[in-house]
């Protein structure tokens, strides 16, 4: 009995000095996905997908957009009378056009290479409108009667402001030969057109000459147009049609016009005074009197996140577009508070845990650390070195992902005419395919980074445990739950030496050896006592059973219930 009491006293003495390795835990409910698991609760996580916008059109870095309201790009450039507010526009950051603007080509027809012109505008930030052929210079032609009820202004017939519809004068239409030399230092956007009458009567009524042509030439352009006279259904009250053309006239280049009828001459041209990143957005939004660094057709984005899922077409300093609904990066550890007894799935290294069943909510100044207990008390202490290394390792995680995904696929809002719908459909499928691949790669990268982060934390905890184990060696006992019981007295100074890696093993080895041997001896003597008692108990039980059997036999023989025969 004395031996058993000594054993209990010794065990309680050793348990009083103990050090444990653990990790931070908190009340977080944030969850992330990894390659191996879904919905892993972590102490800290960072959402890297922007889902919100303000629903407004804003200035981009202080520069207002050109919002065309009910006017199309064609209506603005040609000068639809209903678009007079855009006769002179200041510098713009981007252009906004509605999906189906009411004020387009008021006189029915089409704009040649319109989509290519829009693409050109996506690299321009400012036009300066200049007069190249004054309307008053057409002395041999009627430059005032070329108006139409299809282009009304203040209740009267009118026409596009930037071009002149030339009509015969005094029953004659002399052949036109005009040139304009671009003496500016900037490129010049020049517009002109041709009228296609409804019938021969309209042709001679307007131009006198039954057979006409228009020739246009520059150093890079050689064009000859003839009117196509045909009966057509009326559009905007007109059976005739107009076709408009454009070219970019380089500095010191000249454009030459020659025509004997059906000519819609340029009066104004656009000097391209500033080039830069721009775009034409299809949007029904109104101006919001706000400023942003990133604009989409759905609204402005003000975010520092690296990804967004709002719209593939953006302008400015924008996050990268993905089709994902959720992208969350793990920046902390698996969150398994100590009070939670349900076993969690283990990481690759099995540290958080495998042998450590829960985190410490009491340790708030670091990710990994120690809990000690001795005669002087107990407490938590973070391991600042390993924590700082871990913080350094995850601080730049978002930038690392951006660098790995540094090839942004740009969804360009291309437009195609009716003859190119098949190309448009193919282009859309290609863009959708690129975005699908881009999104998949992003999601996969996040899953891999999350797996790597959690395994990184697991590894750090295991490394800290091994650091203590290698110092203590046989001076302490591993308890299997992340804790060590000392075989010697370990005051606060001793505990601190374990934490900072300066533990003096030889200093405590003799005391530890004696206590370890004493505990082992008590266990062995106790085991011998238990063996003697066990043998005695077995013999006594067998003897008692034999006496009972013999007594029962004698009693049965005496009353005749049992016959006993002894043969010699």
UniProtKB/Swiss-Prot annotation:
Disulfide bonds join 20-483, 58-290, 71-83, 106-151, 294-318, 490-494. GO terms for cellular component: host cell plasma membrane; membrane; viral envelope; virion membrane. GO terms for biological process: clathrin-dependent endocytosis of virus by host cell; fusion of virus membrane with host endosome membrane; fusion of virus membrane with host plasma membrane; viral budding from plasma membrane; virion attachment to host cell. The keyword Glycoprotein applies. One of its GO terms (molecular function) is host cell surface receptor binding. InterPro entries: Capsid_hemagglutn, Hemagglutn_HA1_a/b_dom_sf, Hemagglutn_influenz_A, Hemagglutn_influenz_A/B. It is a single-pass type I membrane protein. Residues 1-16 form the signal peptide. The record marks 346-347 as: Cleavage. It is found in: Virion membrane; Host apical cell membrane. Keywords: Clathrin- and caveolin-independent endocytosis of virus by host, Clathrin-mediated endocytosis of virus by host, Disulfide bond, Fusion of virus membrane with host endosomal membrane, Fusion of virus membrane with host membrane, Glycoprotein, Hemagglutinin, Host cell membrane, Host membrane, Host-virus interaction, Lipoprotein, Membrane, Palmitate, Signal, Transmembrane, Transmembrane helix, Viral attachment to host cell, Viral envelope protein, Viral penetration into host cytoplasm, Virion, Virus endocytosis by host, Virus entry into host cell. The chain crosses the membrane at residues 532-552. Palmitoylated. It comes from the Viruses. Residues 17-531 are extracellular. Residues 553-568 are cytoplasmic. Binds to sialic acid-containing receptors on the cell surface, bringing about the attachment of the virus particle to the cell. This attachment induces virion internalization either through clathrin-dependent endocytosis or through clathrin- and caveolin-independent pathway. Plays a major role in the determination of host range restriction and virulence. Class I viral fusion protein. Responsible for penetration of the virus into the cell cytoplasm by mediating the fusion of the membrane of the endocytosed virus particle with the endosomal membrane. Belongs to the influenza viruses hemagglutinin family. Homotrimer of disulfide-linked HA1-HA2. This is Hemagglutinin. The gene is HA.
